[in-house]
Amino acid sequence: MSQLKITQVRSTIGARWKQRESLRTLGLRRIRHSVIREDNAATRGLIAVVRHLVEVEPAQTGGKT
């Protein structure tokens, strides 16, 4: 399954409780903090709630093979 890199780009000041909880569930704590999550329906739902606070891009699967 593919993965997504999610980066918080805006502050939670003034954000609603549901948006703050969604960021916390994703594992984001501060601006410019990034996490890698599986691309599934649950993750996409959380991203939809906070789409104005985050940037989403495909995760790079780097490493030596």
From Swiss-Prot:
SUPFAM superfamilies, per database record: Ribosomal protein L30p/L7e (SSF55129)
PROSITE patterns per the UniProt record, alphabetical: RIBOSOMAL_L30
Domain of life of the organism encoding this protein: Bacteria
Keywords: Ribonucleoprotein, Ribosomal protein
UniProt xrefs under Gene3D superfamilies: Ribosomal protein L30, ferredoxin-like fold domain (3.30.1390.20)
UniProt record, GO biological process: translation
Molecular-function GO term, any one: structural constituent of ribosome
Cited InterPro entries: Ribo_uL30_ferredoxin-like_sf, Ribosomal_uL30_bac-type, Ribosomal_uL30_CS, Ribosomal_uL30_ferredoxin-like
Entry GO CC: cytosolic large ribosomal subunit
Leader sequence segment: none
Family per record: Belongs to the universal ribosomal protein uL30 family.
Matches recorded under NCBIfam families: rpmD_bact
Quaternary structure (record): Part of the 50S ribosomal subunit.
Name recorded for this polypeptide: Large ribosomal subunit protein uL30
Organism listed in the record: Mycobacterium tuberculosis (strain ATCC 25177 / H37Ra)
